[in-house]
A protein has these predicted regions:
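Generic structural signal for residues in well-ordered beta-strands
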Residues: 12-14, 117, 194-196
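Extracytoplasmic ligand-binding site segments that recognize negatively charged/polar headgroups
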Residues: 1, 17-21, 27, 33-173
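Short alpha-helix C-terminal cap/hinge motif
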Residues: 1-13
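Solvent-exposed polar/charged
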Residues: 6, 110, 137, 189-190
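Periplasmic-binding protein-like
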Residues: 68, 147-152, 158-159, 189-211
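Short low-complexity, flexible loop/linker segments enriched in glycine and/or proline
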Residues: 28-31, 192-194
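Histidine- and/or cysteine-centered catalytic micro-motif in compact active-site loops
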Residues: 122, 180-184, 199-201
Length: 211
């Protein structure tokens, strides 16, 4: 941000919120907008914002090079990255319990993970809704509901933010979480003792966007 201000002379006030919180704020400020640019988060919530008339079309320079499936045809949002979901697990927890990094959704049902999982809340987080999409793709509608009920028994906390669980895992305050890959990579790059892995059953992914 400092470099951007230096290059352009434009001062930036940056506020990080979960995608659900961003959408709620856009809806509340519809008649008196307080935000100029939305950076990051999955495309889903910006589709809602577009349909509710909360955002305006804008075509960024260079966006012609981005494949059509990764941007809105009316230029209401533009994809800037692909975000698959990933498991992030604390290495000390794995060593203590003689476990390998999880490679299946079923691994999270093991007794060792009791009150050790931290997951985002689907009422506020795009990461959480992506998790629910993944579970439905893997287990079917009723199967995903049944699995989520079992999974809930091992969850210590649900958070507003989709990124925050990764930090708690890094700090050792939770055993594992399911987050978007960029949030997991941030924790790895900061030097926390964590392992990133993926469920063999597969995951869905989000398109990270700017609007």
């Amino acid at each position: 941000l400092e470099q951007f201000t230096k290059d352009t002379g434009i001062k930036v006030n940056f506020l990080r919120l979960s995608s659900g919180e961003v959408l709620s704020r856009l809806q509340a400020e519809k008649n008196n907008p307080q935000v100029d640019v939305l950076l990051g988060g999955p495309a889903d919530y910006l589709e809602v914002a577009k349909n509710e008339g909360l955002t305006a079309p804008y075509k960024p320079k260079g966006s012609d090079f981005i494949p059509a499936e990764f941007k809105d045809p009316q230029n209401y949002w533009t994809g800037i990255g692909i975000m698959p979901l990933a498991f992030i697990t604390n290495n000390n927890f794995l060593k203590k319990n003689n476990l390998k990094a999880p490679t299946s959704w079923q691994d999270f049902l093991k007794p060792e993970y009791k009150e050790g999982l931290i997951l985002a809340d689907a009422r506020t987080s795009g990461t959480a809704t992506e998790r629910l999409f993944s579970l439905e793709r893997v287990f079917g509608r009723q199967g995903s509901i049944d699995f989520q009920k079992k999974l809930h028994k091992n969850v210590q906390m649900y958070t507003k933010s989709g990124a925050w669980p990764a930090l708690r895992v890094g700090d050792g305050l939770a055993a594992a979480a399911m987050v978007y890959l960029p949030d997991a990579l941030d924790i790895v790059q900061l030097g926390y003792p964590v392992t990133i892995s993926y469920p063999k059953e597969g995951v869905t992914l989000g398109i990270e966007v700017v609007s």
